[in-house]
Every structure is written in structure tokens, then in C-alpha cells.
């Protein structure tokens, strides 16, 4: 089988957008207190929409992904950790079972190296790396961001051989927020207060001529129609729509939908009309915390 340059697969279609909205239990400080065990998934005893972003260190989100009649066809994990005084985040996704067999057990690894900005409120990536393993073949992309010179460099390798590199200017007063930076910054209110009816435009790393993601939290009237169609009862939930150009993820509409708890944790995520597969679904399985998260990326070569 010959290796083709990376094209986003259905698993990552869900994860890239889902990273915008995973919002968990927030408080000041750098650690998580004990949480009551009787709360439903997606709700926490205490919630605040902003604070020191380093409070997320040690957190891992576990996600199950299904499509058609294949339940839990793939899994994903998102985590934040500190090592030697530097803060990193990783996203890992891989297919399993029969779907894994069909996709050569495809695996995606993302890693961001962060600087802490704005008095601890925002992360800004100095490096963003992506590695894809399909069977025995690998592709890796590195992005370097220098905000002193306002320059973005990128390098792409296939099986250890460089096949592409380039650079572009970073506009002043703009941050190229990769998916992991967006993940934590959105949770911390960097892009604006989270309210029903609100719209957001988020600058991201340019790819295929696209450098922005559009986000809309539906207003109560819009949400009511969807609640009726899907038999949902909780009016405190949020329904979020993300529009990503359909060419990026090979969908018919480019539309991604998220049902979120009142604490902004996605309960269900849907990629609409993925070509040949129909709708794809992701669900939050659980959240764990561990102050010693220093694993995973070294073993796949993202150092």
C-alpha cells in the first residue's frame, strides 16, 4: 500500500471540532479537589468560566466514537501535563476492532508545546506537532511559531524523509491557535463569554486556505426545535454548531453539532453526513486526573 499525504479521517473530524468545547470543572489554583460521586456526567459541584488556565494540568478526557452500527469503533484521549517547567498537551486517537482492521489501525498523535500568556489566562503554542501512523507507515508535521519575528514555519516528513517545508507571516495581534490551544482557551473564556445566541470567529493554523473556524451557540428558540426532534428535556443544555469548510473533512455540509451540559461539557457530538458513512457520533466516557502525566508522546517520537 502506498502512503498518501495526510487527509483528516472521520475520527479526527469529530475530535478537532470537539476540542473547542470540552469544558470541565473549573476553580482557581493548579489542582482539582475531590468531586461528589452522585453528580451526572457533564455536571460538577462548582463551576466558573475563567481563571488560571494551569488548573487543567493533570486532566485527561476519554472519548468513545461510533458510526453506523459500529459502537466504540475508535477511542481518543486529550490531556494536559507539565514536565521540566514546560506545559504540553496531547491528543491521541486510534481505531480498534473490525474498524481498526479496515483502517490499518490508523493512529493520530497531536502535541502542543505551550507558553502561558495574559497573566495565566491563555495558552499560546510555540510548537504544534502531528504524527499519523497507518499500518507501518508514518507521516509527521511540525509547526513552529515565533511571535517575536511573527513567523510560522512548517515541516512535513514521510517515513523520516522531509517532503515539504515553508513559512508564512503571522499577522500582528493574531495567534495561530491550533486545536489543542483552542481547546483550553475556549474553556477559559478567551474567545468571549459563553451564552446562547453567541457567535465566535477563531483564528487557527492555516490549512488548505482556511484560517478561521466559525462557532454558533444556538439561541433558545433554535435549540427548542432540536430538543423536540431528539426528545431532549434539559433546557439548561447548550446546542453548539461549528461550521468548518466541507473540503477539510470531506463532509456534505461541513456542519458539526454538540449537545453540551450546563457546565459546557459535550454530552454528544455529531459530524453530519460524512461521505459514505452518514452521521458520526462521539460521547464523553469519563474524565480522570493525574498529577504525574508525563507519558505517551515520548513513545511515538514527538519530543
Report each predicted region and the residues it spans.
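Bacterial N-terminal signal peptides that target proteins for export
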Residues: 3-15
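Bacterial N-terminal signal peptides
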Residues: 13-23
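Membrane-interface motif at the C-terminal end of an N-terminal transmembrane signal
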Residues: 23-29
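Acidic, serine/threonine-rich low-complexity disordered tracts
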Residues: 32-147, 192-303
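A charged, solvent-exposed segment within the mature domains of Sec-exported extracytoplasmic proteins
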Residues: 137-201
Amino acid at each position: 500500500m502506498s502512503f498518501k499525504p495526510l487527509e483528516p479521517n472521520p475520527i479526527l473530524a469529530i475530535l478537532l471540532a470537539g476540542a473547542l468545547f470540552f469544558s470541565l470543572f473549573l476553580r482557581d489554583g493548579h489542582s482539582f479537589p475531590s468531586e461528589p460521586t452522585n453528580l451526572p456526567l457533564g455536571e460538577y459541584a462548582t463551576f466558573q468560566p475563567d481563571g488560571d488556565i494551569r488548573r487543567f494540568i493533570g486532566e485527561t478526557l476519554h472519548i468513545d466514537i461510533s458510526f453506523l452500527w459500529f459502537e466504540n469503533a475508535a477511542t481518543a484521549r486529550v490531556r494536559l501535563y507539565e514536565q521540566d517547567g514546560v506545559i504540553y498537551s496531547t491528543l491521541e486517537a486510534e481505531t480498534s476492532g473490525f474498524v481498526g482492521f479496515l483502517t490499518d489501525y490508523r493512529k493520530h498523535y497531536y502535541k502542543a508545546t505551550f507558553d502561558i500568556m495574559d497573566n495565566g489566562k491563555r495558552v499560546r503554542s510555540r510548537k504544534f506537532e502531528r504524527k499519523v501512523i497507518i499500518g507501518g507507515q508514518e507521516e509527521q508535521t511540525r509547526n513552529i511559531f515565533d511571535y517575536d519575528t511573527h513567523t510560522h514555519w512548517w515541516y512535513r516528513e514521510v517515513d523520516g524523509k522531509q517532503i515539504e517545508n515553508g513559512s508564512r507571516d503571522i499577522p500582528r495581534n493574531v495567534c495561530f491557535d491550533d486545536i489543542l490551544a483552542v481547546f483550553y482557551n475556549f474553556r477559559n473564556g478567551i474567545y468571549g463569554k459563553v451564552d446562547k445566541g453567541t457567535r465566535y470567529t477563531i483564528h487557527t493554523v492555516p490549512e488548505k486556505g482556511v484560517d478561521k473556524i466559525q462557532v454558533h451557540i444556538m439561541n433558545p428558540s433554535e435549540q427548542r426545535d432540536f430538543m423536540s426532534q431528539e426528545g431532549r428535556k434539559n433546557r439548561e443544555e447548550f446546542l453548539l454548531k461549528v461550521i468548518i469548510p466541507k473540503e477539510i473533512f470531506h463532509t456534505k455540509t461541513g456542519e458539526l453539532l454538540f449537545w453540551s451540559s450546563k457546565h459546557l461539557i459535550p454530552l454528544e457530538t455529531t459530524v453530519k453526513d460524512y461521505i459514505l458513512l452518514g452521521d458520526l457520533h462521539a460521547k464523553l466516557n469519563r474524565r480522570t486526573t493525574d498529577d504525574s502525566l508525563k507519558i505517551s508522546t515520548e513513545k511515538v517520537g514527538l519530543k
